[in-house]
UniProtKB/Swiss-Prot annotation:
GO terms for biological process: regulation of transcription by RNA polymerase II. The lineage of its organism: Eukaryota, Metazoa, Chordata, Craniata, Vertebrata. Belongs to the Mediator complex subunit 6 family. Residues 227-245 have a biased composition (Pro residues). Its main location: nucleus. It is found in: Nucleus. Component of the Mediator complex. It comes from Danio rerio. The gene is med6. GO terms for molecular function: transcription coactivator activity. This is Mediator of RNA polymerase II transcription subunit 6. Residues 190-254 are annotated as: Disordered.
Length: 254
């Protein structure tokens, strides 16, 4: 298995020496940064040359090469150190920035790394959205494409089915059913069998009752809404004619 060099991925690591944290200040922060266990420090820099010559940091301007300087401080916890390439006493090229917060050293990301990380996060989110959308897509040759969401099935399962309330029957319906049952009984009367010991059962004829004309039962609403008929006018008394005797018969003269 190949090992990964930490120097190739310095943006994802940090370094701290807890022995220096209580005494850290602007005068010794560069010495703290130049510890041998610090992976961010380059030992071929001009700072090591000045340290070997036991000179001050002011002599860095007279050398050409990589150097580290204290760029900004905000005591007691924030220190910013810059790595730069010096080409002349007045011309330098920034290479990287490092910030120390409460004794922990981090490398500040460059603009290209920030843009790459943001673009990768956006593409990952878009790809996840497409994958999620495709999981709900369905296709059939006869139906085509449609969406099938799982939430709809769960809602249909959880949603209680409302039972329809049965309405009570009305008086008209009950009377109508009774009339139909009575009519069927008259059309198809039941046949009773009288059994005797040792003989076959003999059917007993049932006298069929004469059918009574069934008056149509009007709905109760019509009877309630129909106004009562006015009373009939009284009939005049019958005229009495006096009894007249029949006319006398006269003899016919020939």
């Amino acid at each position: 298995m190949a090992t990964v060099d930490l120097r190739d991925n310095l943006l994802g690591i940090s370094w701290v020496d807890s022995g220096w944290v209580p005494i850290l200040n602007p005068s010794n922060v560069l010495e703290y940064f130049s510890e041998r266990s610090n992976p961010f420090y380059d030992r071929t820099c001009n700072n090591e040359v000045v340290k070997m010559q036991r000179s001050t940091l002011d002599h860095l301007t007279q050398l050409v090469g990589v150097e580290y300087i204290l760029l900004h401080t905000q005591e007691p916890i924030l220190y910013i150190i810059r790595k730069q390439q010096r080409q002349s006493p007045t011309q330098v090229i920034p290479l990287a920035d490092y910030y120390i917060i409460a004794g922990v050293v981090y490398q500040a990301p460059d603009l290209g790394s920030v843009i790459s990380s943001r673009a990768l996060s956006a593409v990952h989110g878009i790809q996840s959205a497409f994958d999620e959308a495709m999981s709900f897509c369905r296709y059939h040759p006869s139906k085509g494409y449609w969406w099938h969401f799982k939430d709809q099935e769960e809602k249909e399962r959880v949603k209680p089915k409302s039972k329809r309330k049965e309405e009570p029957s009305s008086l008209f319906q009950r009377q109508r059913v009774d009339t139909l049952l009575l009519d069927l009984r008259n059309k198809f009367p039941p046949t009773f069998y009288q059994t005797k010991p040792g003989e076959k059962p003999v059917p007993v004829e049932v006298k069929k009752e004469p059918e009574v004309p069934v008056e149509t039962v009007k709905p109760q609403e019509e009877r309630e809404t129909k106004p009562p008929a006015p009373p009939a006018p009284p009939r005049p008394p019958p005229q009495t004619t006096p009894n007249k005797p029949p006319p006398e018969k006269r003899a016919r003269v020939q």
